[in-house]
């Protein structure tokens, strides 16, 4: 899959976003909340922006960041799949320039799991053709 995505061309990359939210299927996750981390890739042609050096020919990283912040810090959801899906859909709505998006969303501190685990999460890919 990574090879297929690499063939798609240019992309904006946001790594290590951190927000506090109240998502999860366990009641304590909804009342206590926890940290969520994200990586986001947004595919688009960056050739014109690379030549013009003009933000109008690209998409602002801040706009993508704000979508992720709004969703993660917003209304509580039961599933990470839903949270990641909302981020992907709203990111595609930012600009018709964005042709596809990948969202990796994870919980670095998993509530109520009595085991050693680095994180739990989801990774989704959405493009305009399937959205």
From Swiss-Prot:
The active site is at 107 (proton donor/acceptor). Its EC number is 4.1.2.25. The keyword rRNA processing does not apply. Pathway: Cofactor biosynthesis; tetrahydrofolate biosynthesis; 2-amino-4-hydroxy-6-hydroxymethyl-7,8-dihydropteridine diphosphate from 7,8-dihydroneopterin triphosphate: step 3/4. Keywords: Folate biosynthesis, Lyase. CDD domains: DHNA_DHNTPE. Expressed in roots, leaves, stems and siliques. Substrate binds at residues 29, 61, 80-81. GO terms for biological process: folic acid biosynthetic process; tetrahydrofolate biosynthetic process. It catalyses: 7,8-dihydroneopterin = 6-hydroxymethyl-7,8-dihydropterin + glycolaldehyde. The keyword Lyase applies. One of its GO terms (molecular function) is dihydroneopterin aldolase activity. InterPro entries: Dihydroneopterin_aldolase (IPR006156), FolB_dom (IPR006157), GTP-CH-I_C/QueF (IPR043133). Homooctamer. Forms a hollow cylinder assembled from two ring-shaped tetramers. PANTHER family: DIHYDRONEOPTERIN ALDOLASE 1-RELATED. Belongs to the DHNA family. Catalyzes the conversion of 7,8-dihydroneopterin into 6-hydroxymethyl-7,8-dihydropterin, a biosynthetic precursor of the vitamin tetrahydrofolate. Can use L-threo-dihydroneopterin and D-erythro-dihydroneopterin as substrates for the formation of 6-hydroxymethyldihydropterin, but it can also catalyze the epimerization of carbon 2' of dihydroneopterin and dihydromonapterin. This is Dihydroneopterin aldolase 2. It comes from Arabidopsis thaliana (Mouse-ear cress).
């Amino acid at each position: 899959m990574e090879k297929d995505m690499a063939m798609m061309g240019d992309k904006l990359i946001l790594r290590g976003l951190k927000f506090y939210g109240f998502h999860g299927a366990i009641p304590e996750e909804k009342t206590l909340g926890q940290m969520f981390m994200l990586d986001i890739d947004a595919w688009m042609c960056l050739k014109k922006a690379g030549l013009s050096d003009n933000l109008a020919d690209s998409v602002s990283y801040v706009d993508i960041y704000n979508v992720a912040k709004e969703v993660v810090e917003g209304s509580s959801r039961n599933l990470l799949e839903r949270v990641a899906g909302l981020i992907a859909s709203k990111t595609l709505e930012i600009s018709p320039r964005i042709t596809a998006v990948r969202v990796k969303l994870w919980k670095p501190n998993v509530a109520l799991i009595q085991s050693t685990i680095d994180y739990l999460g989801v990774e989704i890919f959405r493009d305009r053709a399937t959205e």
